[in-house]
């Protein structure tokens, strides 16, 4: 069988690949030969120098090292390792007792390298210097010759001498700053800070003349009241606070900012009376509702005439100043009618005399038919008043009992009977 003939292109590709592989193999052989022929004189010299340096260092404590090498690290006593760990910081040097012992040269080198960083890394607290040190700017890597260490001068008791010295220092610094180059970043800020720190504080003298300090104070009410009574509604001095409450019709109006008592001699008994004083025209009922202290006084009230409707006293009248408390912006009349509402018995007393006389008492009814009892019940419910109440007998029939001496006193209400 004849082999199929290859095209000339394929033959050229195969030949090129074979040549490439042959070249790679030849290059690898040359590299191997070159590496094997490299001279080893430098390695021998390095080893001899290390041996000599190690022998010189080990002459001092050779006996101690031989003992340590003779004992394996596993059999070493534990207290030796703990002592070494306490002497040497664990962060800087950690000894591993389980590692096999190294050669003498390696130990000598490690020990010499450990002693150097210990001496360099030991932190020492700097002593307190007399003058504060100002570091240069971050952009400058060296200390400029014109930069100085600024320090705060001691305070003297004499402010004038201190001020003159500060002025001289400022002038010298200003002259020195002109000569110094403009690229320094510390001079301008430091001069300003030193001037602000050392400048004396002028307390009460302005150009040698004493100056009165005006402090904002709140004027008292009696002072303002006396000024109003003497000078009218005009302010007396320029030091008083400016007020606009005198424009209002009354100083006790709720819109005023500062309420002042226009009567300095304020009576002690200034609380307002109960609103029940103003709800009836009868003097007898007024005397019944008064407190024991008010009963001793005459019942005539000139400030508030009696009325049937409880209302807040007028604030625009000057007479209402008697009813104001000594606390500003507070009027007891605003809370009396809300907290102490009038009792419902007050209007009932007025109509009791008219209705009790017109409705006669009904005698007790004997239980009868259902039609009679229903008629009696409807008549009783529709015709009873505040002074007449329903009573139930043993059979559940409502009975109307009129005002009499046996159950309820004449002219009294249910509330009075219950309270008694």
From Swiss-Prot:
Sequence ranges of Low complexity compositional bias: 156-169
Subcellular location: Cytoplasm; Nucleus
Region Disordered: start-end pairs: 30-187, 273-319
Phosphothreonine modifications at: 99, 419
Polar residues composition-biased segments: 277-319
Record-listed Phosphoserine modification sites: 7, 72, 102
Modification type N-acetylserine: residues: 2
This protein's UniProt keywords: Acetylation, Cytoplasm, Nucleus, Phosphoprotein
Residues covered by region (Interaction with SWI6): 2-70
Biased composition (Basic and acidic residues): 43-55, 106-122
Gene Ontology MF annotations: transcription coactivator activity
Signal peptide location: none
Biological process terms in GO annotation: G1/S transition of mitotic cell cycle; positive regulation of mating type switching; positive regulation of transcription by RNA polymerase II; regulation of transcription by RNA polymerase II
Superkingdom per UniProt: Eukaryota
GO cellular component entries: cytoplasm; MBF transcription complex; nucleus; SBF transcription complex; Sin3-type complex
PTM entry text: Phosphorylated by CDC28 in a cell cycle-dependent manner, inhibiting the interaction with SWI6.
The protein's assembly and partners: Interacts with the ANK repeats of SWI6. The interaction with SWI6 is required for function. Interacts with SIN3.
Biological role: Involved in the regulation and timing of MBF-dependent transcription in late G1 of the cell cycle.
Additional note from the record: Present with 319 molecules/cell in log phase SD medium.
Name used for this protein in its record: Protein STB1
Species of the source: Saccharomyces cerevisiae (strain ATCC 204508 / S288c)
């Amino acid at each position: 069988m004849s082999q199929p003939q290859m095209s000339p292109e394929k033959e050229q590709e195969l030949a090129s690949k074979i040549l490439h592989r042959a070249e790679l193999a030849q290059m690898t052989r040359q590299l191997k030969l070159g590496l094997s022929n490299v001279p080893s004189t430098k390695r021998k010299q390095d080893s001899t120098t290390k041996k000599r340096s190690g022998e010189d260092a080990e002459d001092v404590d050779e006996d101690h090292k031989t003992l340590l090498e003779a004992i394996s690290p596993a059999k070493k006593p534990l207290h030796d390792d703990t002592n070494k760990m306490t002497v040497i910081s664990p962060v800087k040097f950690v000894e591993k007792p389980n590692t096999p012992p190294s050669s003498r040269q390696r130990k000598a080198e490690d020990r010499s390298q450990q002693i150097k960083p210990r001496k360099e890394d030991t932190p020492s607290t700097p002593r307190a210097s007399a003058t504060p040190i100002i570091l240069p700017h971050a952009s400058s890597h060296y200390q400029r010759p014109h930069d100085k260490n600024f320090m705060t001068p001691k305070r003297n008791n004499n402010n004038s001498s201190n001020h003159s010295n500060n002025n001289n220092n400022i002038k010298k610094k200003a002259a020195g700053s002109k000569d110094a180059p403009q690229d320094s970043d510390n001079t301008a800020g430091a001069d300003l800070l030193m001037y602000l720190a050392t400048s004396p504080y002028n307390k009460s003298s302005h150009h040698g003349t004493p100056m009165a300090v005006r402090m904002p104070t709140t004027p008292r009410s009696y002072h303002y009241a006396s000024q109003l009574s003497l000078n009218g509604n005009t302010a007396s001095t320029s030091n008083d606070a400016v007020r606009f409450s005198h424009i209002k019709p009354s100083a006790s109006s709720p819109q005023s900012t500062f309420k002042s008592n226009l009567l300095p001699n304020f009576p002690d008994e200034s609380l307002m009376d109960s609103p029940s004083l103003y709800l009836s025209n009868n003097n007898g009922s007024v005397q019944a509702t008064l407190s024991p202290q008010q009963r001793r006084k005459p019942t005539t009230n000139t400030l508030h005439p009696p009325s049937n409707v409880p209302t807040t006293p007028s604030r625009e009248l000057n007479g209402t100043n008697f009813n104001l408390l000594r606390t500003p912006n507070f009027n007891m009349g605003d809370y009396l009618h809300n907290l102490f509402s009038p009792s419902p018995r007050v209007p009932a007393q007025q109509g009791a005399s008219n209705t009790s006389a017109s409705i006669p008492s009904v005698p007790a009814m004997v239980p009868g038919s259902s039609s009679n009892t229903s008629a009696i019940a409807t008549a009783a419910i529709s015709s009873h008043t505040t002074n007449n109440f329903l009573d139930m007998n043993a059979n559940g029939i409502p009975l109307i009992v009129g005002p009499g001496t046996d159950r309820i006193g004449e002219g009294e209400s249910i509330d009075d009977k219950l309270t008694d």
